[in-house]
């Protein structure tokens, strides 16, 4: 009887482990997106990074001009988040013709109690047990479309955060909805500018001067949103997430988010010459 009693939790644990391995466990060690996409990642100068930053900021400025705003002049999505989830899936799957490994049958799932995710400093999370791409829809609207596409990248098998960010950027560019394109370019510009600031503050100042007032409002609002959730709980969550990423083959941990910039540089290298 005791052996039979023990067999139940053992069976449950085995099933959970099997789900983790089949739905997630091997994906962090698959071929990188850079390898299968044909993009050549290489060292780049600060001037090359500036060119990408300037291009992205100018694109963001242009896209932002006619987008809806709230009463504070901050970007606001015009559609219901469930309609945006449909658009995210459509835009993501349109990448399949160019990148054959990108496709999913799933859709992003707006989370009902999203503010809890904000307290944990989480904008989205892929659940390998339910095979769901969960998205925080309490955060600023500017990040919701690109986060939806980011989580679909995980659903498609790309678990590295840097690659998922870049794939999400590509998916947003595919959309016919300017709100999606703006969201993708916004995220890319933030990552690129953060990288530029670490290598050349003068070039960063030159690029920063290009930002429109509307883009600045969105950046300030987004920063203020996350600032209010900087608590001991979010710090613990960051440490757990860092350990989680390292345990799954992302040796740079949370810093691997910054590696998206290398893919951006590779993507724009020929386009900006």
Task: Explain the meaning of each model-derived region.
Residues 165-217:
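Active-site/pore-lining binding-face segments in mid-to-C-terminal subdomains
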Residues 146-165, 169-170:
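Active-site recognition of the HExxH zinc-binding catalytic motif
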Residues 25-93, 97:
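Membrane-interface segments at or immediately adjacent to transmembrane helices
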Residues 1-12:
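Cytosolic-side transmembrane helix boundary signature
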Residues 215-273:
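Pan-zinc metallopeptidase signature
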Residues 65-137, 141:
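Auxiliary, metal-adjacent structural segments of Zn-dependent hydrolase domains
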Residues 39-46, 77-81, 134-138, 149-156, ...:
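Second-shell loop/turn segments in exported
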Residues 10-21:
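Hydrophobic alpha-helical transmembrane segments of multi-pass integral membrane proteins
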């Amino acid at each position: 009887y005791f052996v039979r009693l023990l067999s139940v939790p053992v069976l449950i644990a085995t099933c959970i482990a099997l789900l983790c391995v089949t739905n997630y466990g091997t994906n962090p060690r698959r071929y990188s997106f850079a390898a299968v996409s044909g993009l050549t990642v290489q060292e780049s100068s600060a001037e090359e990074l500036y060119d990408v930053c300037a291009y992205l900021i100018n694109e963001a400025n242009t896209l932002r001009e006619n987008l809806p705003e709230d009463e504070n002049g901050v970007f606001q999505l015009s559609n219901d988040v469930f309609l945006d989830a449909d658009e995210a899936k459509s835009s993501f799957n349109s990448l399949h013709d160019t990148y054959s490994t990108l496709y999913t049958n799933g859709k992003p799932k707006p989370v009902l109690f999203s503010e809890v995710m904000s307290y944990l400093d989480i904008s989205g999370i892929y659940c390998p047990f339910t095979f769901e791409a969960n998205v925080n829809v309490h955060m600023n609207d500017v990040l919701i479309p690109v986060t939806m596409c980011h989580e679909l990248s995980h659903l498609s098998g790309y678990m590295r955060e840097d690659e998922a960010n870049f794939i999400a950027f590509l998916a947003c560019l595919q959309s016919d909805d300017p709100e999606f394109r703006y969201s993708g370019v916004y995220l890319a510009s933030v990552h690129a500018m953060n990288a530029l600031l670490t290598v050349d503050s003068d070039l960063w100042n030159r690029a920063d001067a290009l930002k429109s007032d509307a883009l600045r409002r969105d950046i300030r609002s987004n920063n203020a949103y996350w600032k209010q959730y900087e608590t001991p709980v979010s710090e613990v969550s960051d440490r757990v997430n860092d350990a989680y990423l390292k345990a799954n083959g992302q040796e740079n941990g949370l810093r691997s988010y910054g590696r998206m910039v290398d893919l951006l540089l590779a993507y724009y290298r020929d386009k900006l010459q």
